[in-house]
């Protein structure tokens, strides 16, 4: 019998203290070993509640932010999810534990391929990846029940929000003057309501597919 990783236990306690109350979200994070998504040189910090650098000048998000964003989506196992910014694949792997299927777009080829290898090793078969311009979403697969952005949009990401199904929820960091705010969007017919959740710090959402890397 494999004993629980004490680092994961400590992280779970930290997440609960930070406001993560959804047991399913907590379970998804517990079943997604973060050290598999962190560069080896940062392996000793994999279970610290902090963002860490990854390749291509990007980051793997702080576990608390991953958990709170996932919780804000109110996922169930029927949801079709769009993720903008695959990065290390950590957020997509957590989503895949809770949703029917995850479609994830990444502008960096290196990151997308590394994430795909991790998904395969973890036998996560309900994640579909694409290398491309995340600012355009994934219109060929729209509409989506849920949408999540893991990079901060300079303004409300209307092109992406157009791909949200009626009754759907999106969560995205958005630039506001000298700060970034995590915003939850909810579609009701042709109307989209906004709720500010918290201040955050993310890498910027960049237009286009990266020519190198």
UniProtKB/Swiss-Prot annotation:
Entry's Gene Ontology BP terms: methylation; protein modification process; protein repair
Bilayer-crossing regions: none
EC number(s) recorded for this UniProt protein: 2.1.1.77
A single GO molecular function term of this UniProt record: protein-L-isoaspartate (D-aspartate) O-methyltransferase activity
InterPro entries per UniProt: PCMT, SAM-dependent_MTases_sf
Function per UniProt: Catalyzes the methyl esterification of L-isoaspartyl residues in peptides and proteins that result from spontaneous decomposition of normal L-aspartyl and L-asparaginyl residues. It plays a role in the repair and/or degradation of damaged proteins.
Protein name (record): Protein-L-isoaspartate O-methyltransferase
């Amino acid at each position: 019998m494999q004993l629980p990783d004490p680092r994961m236990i400590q992280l779970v306690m930290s997440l609960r203290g930070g406001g993560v109350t959804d047991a399913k979200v907590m379970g998804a994070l517990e079943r997604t070993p973060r050290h598999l998504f962190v560069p080896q040189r940062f392996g000793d910090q994999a279970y610290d509640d902090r963002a860490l650098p990854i390749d291509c000048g990007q980051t793997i998000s702080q576990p608390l932010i991953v958990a709170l964003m996932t919780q804000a989506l109110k996922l169930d196992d029927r949801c079709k999810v769009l993720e903008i910014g695959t990065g290390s694949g950590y957020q997509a792997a957590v989503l895949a534990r809770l949703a029917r299927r995850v479609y994830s777009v990444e502008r960096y080829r290196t990151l997308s391929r590394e994430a795909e290898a991790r998904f395969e090793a973890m036998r996560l078969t309900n994640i579909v990846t694409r290398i491309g311009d995340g600012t355009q979403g994934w219109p060929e697969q729209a509409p989506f029940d849920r949408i999540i952005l893991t990079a901060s949009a300079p303004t409300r990401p209307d092109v992406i929000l157009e791909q949200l199904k009626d009754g759907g929820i999106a969560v995205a960091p958005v630039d506001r003057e000298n700060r970034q705010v995590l915003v939850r969007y909810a579609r009701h017919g042709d109307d989209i309501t906004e709720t500010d959740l918290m201040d955050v710090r993310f890498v910027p959402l960049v237009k286009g597919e990266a020519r190198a890397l």
